[in-house]
Structures are given as structure tokens and as C-alpha cells.
Swiss-Prot record:
A zinc finger (C4-type) spans 38-59. Pfam families: Ribosomal_L37ae. It comes from Thermococcus kodakarensis (strain ATCC BAA-918 / JCM 12380 / KOD1) (Pyrococcus kodakaraensis (strain KOD1)). Belongs to the eukaryotic ribosomal protein eL43 family. This is Large ribosomal subunit protein eL43.
């Protein structure tokens, strides 16, 4: 196993790809693995099931979102536009 103190979960790549890339991967994975707010019940219990599929552990709501985060910047813009038109 490689040294992981600097890059955490990206230590699995060993010395490959450079430190900057591995730090970036570790930051994305850390944000992905934390619990997120459910759009249905509002609880902080949403976990990623697979790429782009998210599920709330509390209410069981399953929805599509971004690959690494349940809401993407483009999704936020689209939601804001549809809310202003309604």
C-alpha cells in the first residue's frame, strides 16, 4: 500500500499521475462519500448508490443527480429558471 497521508483514498494510485491530481481526486471522493441533504424529506441522509444515482436512507427516495454530487451547478441553474417561470 502506498503512502496515503497526503492524498487519503487516492493513495491507491501510488506514485502515478502526480500529487496535484491525486489531491483533487481525494477531495472529490471525500465530498461524494459524505451524507447530503434529501430533496424530498430534507434530512441529511442521501448516499450514492452508483454513478449518478442517489438514495435517501431515511425516506427511501431514489433520484438521479450528478456523478459525484447529488446536485450539479447546471441542475441548480435549471431549477432556478423553472422556479422563476412558474
Amino acid at each position: 500500500m502506498g503512502r496515503t497521508t497526503k492524498v487519503g483514498s487516492a493513495g491507491r494510485f501510488g506514485p502515478r499521475y502526480g500529487l496535484k491530481i491525486r489531491r483533487r481526486v481525494a477531495a472529490v471522493e471525500a465530498r461524494m462519500k459524505q451524507k447530503h441533504v434529501c430533496p424530498v424529506c430534507g434530512r441529511k441522509a442521501v448516499r450514492r448508490i452508483s454513478t449518478g444515482i442517489w438514495q435517501c436512507q431515511k425516506c427511501g427516495a431514489t433520484f438521479a443527480g450528478g456523478a459525484y454530487l447529488p446536485t450539479t451547478p447546471a441542475g441548480k441553474v435549471a431549477k432556478r429558471v423553472t422556479a422563476s417561470k412558474a
